[in-house]
């Protein structure tokens, strides 16, 4: 009979790509993961890892076995969720991947709330970009993602995942203090034709929003600089290098050289918690969603 922990180690290597990353996700040492894989190779009489450059990669047989392991681990997760539901107390480890501004502006309060209410719940946070986190949940790399989409660019979930809305994060046009629009009560997208934009790189949710919104207004956005983090975008705006749309969550105080102007219509970023359907009955999932919504209620709209 195949050992579940060894299958878990193989699945982790398949998800994370390297033995070192798999070990970090499992809380093991790399040598311990390698030993588990070696034992699984002896159990199956099959080569599972092969040398590739300076590292290793899964063989074709290993990839197929990892797919089966994923299904088995899903059944185990469902069984564990049912047992936790019967006990009624959130417990065990729950790994959460949150996008940067949520990790900064939302999650510290959530972690503190859950730690005080449920000491048996071991919540682990990772800061992960939203274009990656949902896939990590689907692959079993994390238990939950705190992610977002925009009203004009809705998110489609892969099969087997569930979500719950946390709240709606409003965004503002951010411009240098001396900008021609700095004193306006509000501005429409049509008035932004020709403006130099600073935004996140192509492929990111925020970049997709900008392109869709400006094209709908009849022009192509002229993106001159890109950066991953909103504080960097604000710094570029402060230097007079462009304008940006910055959500309010986790934004923090702005430099004196930067002002915000409301947009009409207001850009809305929608926040979600996403998890695998097998874990839906876990009290830990329900309680984390509760804490997220409660914390959102206290920070929503903060500048």
Question: Could you say what each language-model-derived stretch is?
Answer:
Residues 12-27:
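Short helix-boundary/capping micro-motifs
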Residues 41-58:
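A short LG(V/I)-centered, amphipathic sequence patch enriched
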Residues 91-154, 227:
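Central regulatory/effector-binding core of bacterial HTH transcription factors
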Residues 129-142, 148, 199, 203-259:
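Hydrophobic hinge/microswitch elements
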């Amino acid at each position: 009979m195949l050992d579940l922990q060894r299958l878990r180690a193989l699945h982790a290597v398949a998800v994370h790509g390297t033995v070192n990353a798999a070990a970090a996700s499992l809380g093991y040492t790399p040598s311990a993961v390698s030993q588990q894989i070696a034992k699984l190779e002896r159990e199956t009489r099959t080569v599972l890892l092969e040398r590739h450059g300076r590292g290793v990669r899964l063989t074709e047989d290993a990839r197929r076995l990892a797919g089966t392991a994923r299904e088995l681990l899903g059944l185990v997760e469902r069984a564990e969720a049912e047992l936790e539901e019967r006990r009624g107390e959130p417990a065990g480890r729950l790994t959460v991947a949150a996008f940067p501004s949520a990790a900064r502006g939302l999650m510290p309060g959530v972690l503190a709330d859950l730690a005080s209410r449920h000491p048996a719940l071991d919540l682990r946070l990772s800061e992960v970009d939203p274009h990656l986190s949902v896939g990590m949940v689907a692959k079993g790399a994390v238990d939950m993602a705190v992610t977002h989409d925009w009203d004009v660019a809705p998110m489609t979930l892969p099969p087997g995942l569930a979500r719950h809305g946390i709240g709606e994060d409003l965004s503002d046009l951010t411009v240098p203090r001396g900008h021609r629009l700095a004193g306006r009560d509000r501005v429409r997208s049509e008035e932004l034709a020709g403006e130099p934009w600073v935004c996140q790189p192509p492929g990111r949710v925020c970049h997709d929003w900008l392109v869709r919104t400006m094209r709908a207004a009849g022009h192509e956005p002229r993106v001159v600089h890109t950066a991953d983090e909103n504080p960097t975008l604000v710094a570029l705006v402060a230097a007079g290098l462009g304008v940006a749309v910055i959500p309010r969550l986790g934004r923090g105080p702005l430099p004196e050289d930067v002002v915000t102007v409301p947009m009409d219509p207001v850009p809305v970023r929608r926040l979600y918690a996403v998890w695998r359907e097998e874990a839906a009955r876990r009290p830990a999932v329900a309680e984390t969603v509760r804490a997220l919504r409660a914390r959102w209620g206290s920070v929503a709209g903060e500048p």
